């Protein structure tokens, strides 16, 4: 798929100009591919581990003979938790480094910032994070969960547990706001009261006002779409306010195994999380993935949904 898509869409004669302008070189024994993940900033806790999964997958693809006999050369960039930097790095990878495809992006804001780069150059982005839908592009492979695969099942579960009211909280960008719009529509159709809704800037560490409002609202549960380092601050304030999972559980959309390590497992006892993948998935393929990852990076390391999605995306290039 990578070598077939270098600069042109299969069967798309209208893309011939873009193909002629492409600087991707497939004449040698290697093909360059890129990775853009936040290795610094507030999202590094969630994104840096995704780079590890991508690196492992590239090594495995190369060990098995590469793509159409060509080894992959990985060029990595730091998105620094800023959408504008993601766009700048995407342009560098496509126009200067001449990569055949890019793996990366985390927030919907970073994906949307990069989208014009890939469409204008007719290049490929493999986006492995969950996303809100409402967008499609022939230049993006969306390999993460959509809302009907993550948000709706989590709401169904809360409803089954007798939840009659929710407080919505999220980081302030596209995915959390769109997710909560879906939550509100679901709530209206299912007789669930929305007690409140608040957003905080990416990277925010002050949740005192929001958590105080949550505590006062006394909802049955919290629907949480906060991401990155902000999760640590949110749960720290949640505990400081005397809230517990038994009193007001938190259903999180962006807390996976790596975030549990960062926040601390004792803080998250009996809390809820919704993902398409967990490290404990009992299949031969996952056991191999987890074993290979730990063999490379250490027995104490964990795998998560975004990591698995990125890892799988690289292997789809074979």
Model features per residue range: what roles?
Residues 39, 140-202, 221:
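An alpha-beta-alpha
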Residues 19-21, 45-52, 65-133, 201-204:
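Beta-alpha junction/loop-to-helix N-cap segments that form part of ligand/metal-binding clefts
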């Amino acid at each position: 798929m990578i070598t077939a898509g270098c600069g042109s869409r299969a069967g798309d004669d209208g893309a011939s100009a873009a193909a002629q302008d492409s600087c991707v070189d497939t004449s040698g024994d290697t093909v360059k591919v890129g990775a853009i993940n936040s290795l610094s900033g507030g999202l590094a806790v969630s994104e840096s581990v995704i780079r590890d999964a991508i690196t492992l997958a590239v090594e495995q693809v190369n060990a098995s003979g590469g793509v159409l006999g060509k080894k992959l050369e990985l060029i990595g960039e730091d998105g620094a938790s800023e959408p504008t930097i993601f766009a700048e790095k995407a342009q560098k990878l496509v126009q200067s480094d001449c990569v055949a495809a890019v793996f990366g992006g985390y927030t919907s804001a970073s994906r949307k910032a990069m989208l014009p780069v890939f469409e204008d150059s007719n290049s490929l982005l493999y986006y492995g994070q969950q996303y809100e839908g409402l967008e499609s592009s022939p230049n993006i492979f969306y390999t993460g969960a959509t809302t009907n695969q993550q948000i709706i099942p989590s709401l169904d579960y809360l409803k089954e547990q007798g939840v009659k009211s929710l407080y919505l909280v999220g980081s302030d960008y596209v995915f959390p706001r769109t997710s909560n719009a879906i939550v509100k529509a679901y709530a209206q159709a299912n007789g669930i009261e929305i007690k409140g809704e608040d957003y905080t800037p990416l990277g925010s560490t002050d949740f005192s006002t929001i958590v105080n409002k949550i505590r006062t609202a006394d909802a049955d549960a919290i629907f949480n779409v906060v991401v990155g380092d902000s999760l640590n601050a949110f749960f720290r304030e949640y505990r400081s306010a005397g809230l517990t999972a038994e009193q007001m559980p938190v259903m999180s959309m962006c807390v996976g195994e790596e975030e549990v390590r960062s926040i601390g497992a004792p803080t998250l006892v009996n809390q809820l999380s919704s993902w398409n993948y967990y490290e404990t998935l009992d299949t031969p393929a996952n056991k191999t993935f987890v074993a290979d990852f730990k063999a490379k990076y250490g027995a104490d390391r964990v795998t998560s949904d975004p990591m698995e999605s990125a890892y799988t995306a690289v292997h789809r290039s074979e």
